[in-house]
Design a protein with these regions (language model features):
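N-terminal donor/sugar-recognition subdomains of glycan-related enzymes
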Residues: 1-53, 63-65, 194, 208-245
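Amphipathic coiled-coil/heptad-repeat helices and related helical stalk/stem segments
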Residues: 40, 62-65, 80, 104, ...
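Short, basic, glycine/proline-bearing loop/turn elements
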Residues: 49-55, 70, 145-152, 192, ...
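Glycine-rich anion-binding loop/nest that anchors nucleotide
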Residues: 55-60, 159, 174-188, 224-226
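Glycine-rich N-terminal segment of FAD-binding domains in flavoprotein oxidoreductases
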Residues: 56-69, 76-88
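Short glycine-/acidic-enriched loop or helix-start segments at secondary-structure transitions
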Residues: 64-67, 88-89, 107-109, 129-130, ...
């Protein structure tokens, strides 16, 4: 079931970014046609439900966070697109990767080959990249619009905040954000190639506001190791081992 109130938030996104809903729906239909089977949610729930989950973004603080993250091998790591490269370069395999396929495709494929579950998001601007999803071993499709067929809607807008919405939807007891900075600097792993920085920052601001909205509805303990987010408790990386055992 889609999060209560999400449709209103989705309409805000369409209006604020001038997105074409027809293209959004078309993209979801194309992704649905590429997916051979519908990945069962219990495969994800086994990694998330009633567990402490790390959500890892590609913000500037990610690089300095990696030595701490490597200490928590047994905990589920849900990773936003670009951060996948940073983790794999440091011998950390994501459990789940949330991507709209604009990250480094070689590392996304490596994650899939290492048994990561790939959550591929369809939107109006990535239709030409959706065929990449065919090569992923374990793949679930998502949309911000109405779910159907093999396509789900857990909520969320950017890869980073979609990770949090996913963890919340599937019943994580504690969600800890790492590398989720939502600041004015873009991390080196955040996006491949040329992009519009102003639009990128606008998307990050929207993602942050969605997490603040989610925090008012979530039953999970919510923490961030980076810049403050309303509804999330701040915790230092050095104190994580006291919190998580």
């Amino acid at each position: 079931m889609t999060l209560n109130g999400w449709q209103e938030k989705y309409q805000e996104i369409l209006n604020e970014f001038n997105y074409n809903r027809v293209r959004e729906i078309r993209s979801a239909k194309i992704l649905n046609s590429f997916l051979k089977t519908r990945l069962q949610l219990n495969k994800l729930e086994r990694k998330i439900k009633n567990k402490t989950v790390f959500v890892i973004g590609a913000g500037p603080s990610l690089v300095s966070s990696l030595p701490y993250l490597k200490k928590f091998k047994k905990f589920t790591k849900i990773v936003a697109d670009g951060a996948t490269q940073a983790l794999i370069e440091n011998q950390v395999i994501p459990d789940i990767v949330v991507t709209d396929l604009d990250g480094n495709m070689a590392y996304l494929k490596k994650a899939s080959e290492s048994e990561s579950i790939m959550i591929v998001h369809a939107h109006g601007d990535n239709i030409n990249k959706l065929p990449y999803a065919i090569s992923f071993k374990y793949c679930l499709g998502t949309t911000e619009d109405k779910p159907f067929g093999k396509i789900r809607n857990f909520g969320g807008f950017t890869d980073g905040d979609r990770c949090v919405f996913l963890a919340n939807h599937l019943g994580a007891s504690r969600i800890i954000l790492i590398g989720m900075d939502f600041g004015t600097n873009i991390g080196k792993y955040s996006k491949e190639g040329i992009y519009n920085k102003d639009i990128k920052l606008k998307k990050l601001r929207k993602g942050k506001s969605l997490l603040e909205w989610l925090s008012s509805q979530s039953n999970a303990e919510l923490y961030t190791t980076s810049k403050p987010i309303s509804g999330f408790k701040n915790i230092r990386l050095a104190d994580l081992q006291k919190l998580v055992r």
